[in-house]
A protein has these predicted regions:
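Single conserved hydrophobic/aromatic residue that forms the stacking wall/gate
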Residues: 1-8, 12
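Short, basic/hydrophobic alpha-helical segments
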Residues: 13-25, 192-199
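Conserved GNAT acetyl-CoA-binding A-motif
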Residues: 22-33, 199-207
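Short, glycine/charge-rich beta-strand/loop segments that flank catalytic centers
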Residues: 25-43, 56-58
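Conserved active-site alpha-helix within GNAT-family acetyltransferase domains
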Residues: 36-52, 80, 210-227
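Acyltransferase donor/substrate-recognition loop-hinge adjacent to the catalytic core
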Residues: 45-121
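A conserved beta-strand-loop-helix scaffold within acyl/acetyltransferase catalytic domains
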Residues: 93-179
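Aromatic (often tryptophan-rich) hydrophobic motifs at membrane interfaces
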Residues: 145-236
Length: 237
């Protein structure tokens, strides 16, 4: 059940009662989207709560067609990077839809990517992310996700995992990793994954930036149509 449905308000009330009656503690809720917050406010459920926008957790929402075609002046640099990649590595790469049979190879690539990045990871963001990555990879057969990769000279050099919600025609990009030394590779898999795996998507949610400046700039450079706000809702003490 989506958080913004009427059922979510019932769940909220039960949780509040449980926190108060059984645990004698205030109820704090993280990562509440803007629509859910508004529904709860209109229902009068948040009179005794503060709401704090968590910028580091805002999701980035894009027009899928723009990311697939890279058309328009705003995407000119991105398109140039893709074209540069196509010219420089012509005949050496292929896009491939990946499946559970490719998991061990994907894990091997991911480990290599992690080892190369940890040296520059001052705030342990990579290790914080790693648990979620391996949970996804380890449950390949039980989760409804798509996975795609770029093979360079036969070996995986980039991979992406995402999912699709047909009711809102939105693709969600959960993981995207590529060899950073290969110029244009991130841009190419970004584009090709959507083209091959989510052709019907109207919107793309590339999730949050974890508060990392480089990731924030990269996501902003793709010109999101909006940011999906997230809130920390805290019961007043």
């Amino acid at each position: 059940t989506p958080l913004y449905s009427s059922a979510a308000s019932d769940v909220y009330k039960r949780q509040e009662k449980q926190f108060h009656d059984e645990w004698n503690t205030p109820l704090d809720i993280y990562l509440v989207d803007d629509l859910t917050k508004n529904v709860w406010e209109q229902a009068g459920l948040l009179k005794n709560y503060t709401r704090t926008a968590e910028r580091d957790s805002f999701d980035y929402i894009y027009e899928a067609e723009k990311l697939k075609t890279l058309s328009g002046r705003a995407m000119h640099k991105k398109k140039n990077l893709v074209n540069s990649f196509l010219r420089e590595y012509e005949g050496r790469f292929v896009y491939e839809t990946l499946g559970c049979g490719d998991i061990e190879e994907v894990k091997e690539f991911h480990e290599k990517w992690l080892d190369e990045r940890r040296h520059y990871d001052r705030f342990n963001c990579i290790d914080d992310e790693e648990e979620g990555v391996y949970r996804l990879l380890g449950n390949c057969k039980s989760i409804d996700c798509a996975m795609g990769g770029i093979r360079m000279d036969g070996k995986i050099a980039a991979y992406t995992i995402g999912s699709y919600c047909p009711s809102i025609q939105c693709a969600f990009i959960h993981i995207e990793k590529a060899e950073p030394e290969i110029k244009g590779l991130y841009n190419y898999i970004n584009q090709q994954f959507l083209i091959h795996e989510f052709p019907d998507a109207v919107y793309v949610n590339r999730e949050d930036d974890l508060g990392q400046d480089n990731l924030r700039q990269a996501k902003l450079s793709y010109k999101p149509i909006r940011l999906e706000e997230k809130y920390y809702i805290q019961e007043k003490r």
